[in-house]
Amino acid sequence: MITLTGYCLNTTGQDAKDSTALRPTFGATLTSDMQTDFQETRIQHLLELSAEVPLSRKLTMQVHSMSAKASNEEWLYYDMQGFSNIDCYEDVPFALTVAGLEWKINDRHTLFAGIRRTDEDYFCSDVLGMFTNSSMGIFPTLSYNYIVNTYPEAAMGVHYAYDDERWRLQASLYNGIGNHDFKGGYNVFRFCPKDDGLLLLGQVEYRWRGSSYYLGGSKHTEDEAPYTMWAYAEQKLWPNVTLLATYGHAFGKESLCDNFYGGGATMTLKNWDLAVFTDYMEVLGFGQWSTEIGIGWHVSEVLTVKPVLHIMKLDEEDTKLVGLMRVCIEL
């Protein structure tokens, strides 16, 4: 009787755990930028929705979407990096960013198959996420050399990850061209390696005492596409201060952007974040320095307000200042 009772109690506990683990989760994030060059203003909105529905303890269906709308199509300043990482070259009523199945092989190994964006897994650390510069979401040594499946584009493919306390290893294979449309010859469901080629990415991350170090690379199967590599380090100096250093390089004669490098720091004080970063990139002989200074105020668990100043210098042109007020509501 004692054994049977113990067995029943354990079974009940396991059932409760399974019930909790198999609950679907939903999320919504609204990000709005008010941008100004101190002469004109522009507003950009981004709505992101997510749903994760467990089909079993090891298999989960993931569906994420985005919608983008701007007050006008003309950008305030066509800098080479993109000072706002939610700007789109056109309004996007609805697009899938993730749609597929994730298989949790065990506690350390996962495999995803379906539609996905590279910035779901790469260049998405908490420190990089403090900045609004698009180069912090994907280094320009990739975005200029490939039609890569990063915001607002996605592509069909597979993504593998190994994760333990110290190490995280990732490898991805995607259709060689990203899209966000649902119709036409080029759409988000397209998988045509013969015409589009394949994009391969890999990254190693090492974590130690609050610091993180990343080394990655990519290759497109198109004949003249360059190899790229990147490295960045997030060095924790004190519990609330982190130094950031980044470098990206593309190998090949046909490379549009050969080098990208920069450095900065972040500081967290209670409900406030301070982030400063400066970088340099060169595209076809034209270079641009960019500096970002931002302050994030976490008003509540769901609301963040972030004023940002961008200082940009393109070769012989005058220095350009752009201000940005970002409001983010996350549910």
Model-inferred region functions:
Residues 12-13, 74-98, 108-200, 328:
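Surface-exposed coil loops of outer-membrane beta-barrel proteins
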Residues 14-37, 61-63, 134, 140:
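Transmembrane beta-strand segments of Gram-negative outer membrane beta-barrel proteins
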Residues 37-45, 55-99, 104-105:
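Surface-exposed loop and membrane-interface regions of Gram-negative outer-membrane beta-barrel proteins
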Residues 26-32, 63-67, 113-117, 171-175, ...:
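Transmembrane beta-barrel strands of outer-membrane/channel proteins
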Residues 18-28, 55-63, 107-111, 165-169, ...:
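Outer-envelope beta-barrel architecture signal
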Residues 51-55, 103, 115, 161-164, ...:
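Residue-level signature of outer-membrane beta-barrel architecture
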Residues 57-58, 165-169, 201, 205-284:
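Detector for outer-membrane/organellar transmembrane beta-barrel domains
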Residues 319-331:
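Outer-membrane beta-barrel "beta-signal"
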